[in-house]
Swiss-Prot record:
NDH-1 shuttles electrons from NADH, via FMN and iron-sulfur (Fe-S) centers, to quinones in the respiratory chain. The immediate electron acceptor for the enzyme in this species is believed to be a menaquinone. Couples the redox reaction to proton translocation (for every two electrons transferred, four hydrogen ions are translocated across the cytoplasmic membrane), and thus conserves the redox energy in a proton gradient. Residues 1-20 are annotated as: Disordered. GO terms for cellular component: plasma membrane. It catalyses: a quinone + NADH + 5 H(+)(in) = a quinol + NAD(+) + 4 H(+)(out). Transmembrane segments: none annotated. GO terms for molecular function: NADH dehydrogenase (ubiquinone) activity; NADH:ubiquinone reductase (non-electrogenic) activity; quinone binding. It comes from Mycolicibacterium smegmatis (strain ATCC 700084 / mc(2)155) (Mycobacterium smegmatis). Keywords: Cell membrane, Membrane, NAD, Quinone, Translocase, Transport. Residues 1-11 have a biased composition (Polar residues). It is found in: Cell membrane. Belongs to the complex I 30 kDa subunit family. It holds the Pfam family Complex1_30kDa. This is NADH-quinone oxidoreductase subunit C. NDH-1 is composed of 14 different subunits. Subunits NuoB, C, D, E, F, and G constitute the peripheral sector of the complex.
Length: 238
């Protein structure tokens, strides 16, 4: 059975190939990534691309091959190709990038199959890459198999223009508040969640404060007798 990496585009569920090369998500200039001309560090002319790791060729190492072999066997060749965008092993962590349409089905297999048994989802982490066109919003799900003492993670991407990802509440009920927090801070809409409302910010809050395009602001703070202005009013070198 073929288990080659990647074929489904996670933004729309259509079978489009993903490249095996690292994915450039930003270009940083200067040592501190500043965007103006006020760099006084002497490193203002540095240019560094920021990239996500590309697909990892087999063998993956350790139990990772056994996990992917079994997942491919249960899904079947056609469904595997529709579901799995690519497989990345980076710093001893297996990440399975999944088409968002197929996320609940893949998670159900990982939870229920006796040879996999990833019974526990440890949470949901949102990430915003504003320069990753068409894949600006990412959701990452760390999974753990208590039965087999294994850890992997799933990753799903969605565009800013259509920030919808299927909820995993029906598969892992413990994601309830985690998905609410990710919605609150990043604006990812988890379709099928039983009560997708803000959990930390006020209900009438505008915007999602952990997105990189969220405006910097704040209130002044008094500390040891000194008045510290909010971040958007502090001294700059521009």
């Amino acid at each position: 059975m073929s288990t080659s990496n990647g074929s489904a585009n996670g933004t729309n569920g259509v079978g489009l190939p993903r490249g095996d090369e690292p994915e450039i998500i930003a270009v940083r200039r200067g040592m501190f990534g500043n965007r103006d001309t006020g760099d006084t560090s002497g490193y203002g002319r540095l240019v560094r691309p920021v990239a996500l790791p590309g697909s990892t060729p087999r063998p993956y190492g350790g139990y990772f091959d056994a996990v992917m072999d079994r997942l491919a066997e249960v899904l079947g060749e056609e469904r595997y190709a529709m579901s799995i965008e690519r497989v990345v092993v980076y710093r001893d962590q297996l990440t399975i990038e999944v088409s968002r349409v197929q996320l609940p089905a893949v998670a159900s297999v990982l939870r229920d199959d006796p040879d996999l048994r990833f019974e526990l989802c440890l949470g949901v982490s949102g990430v915003h890459y504003p320069e990753d066109t068409g894949r600006e919003l990412h959701a990452v799900y760390p999974l753990m198999s208590i039965t087999h003492n294994r850890r992997i993670q799933l990753e799903v991407a969605a565009p800013d223009a259509d920030p919808h990802i299927p909820s995993l509440y029906a598969v892992y009920p413990t994601t309830d508040w985690h998905e609410r927090e990710t919605y609150d801070f990043f604006g990812i809409i988890f379709d099928g969640h039983p009560s997708l409302t803000r959990i930390e910010m006020p209900d009438d809050w505008e915007g999602h404060p952990q997105r990189k395009d969220y405006p910097l602001g704040g209130i002044p703070v008094e500390y040891h007798g000194a008045q510290i202005p909010p971040p958007d009013q502090r001294r700059s070198y521009s």
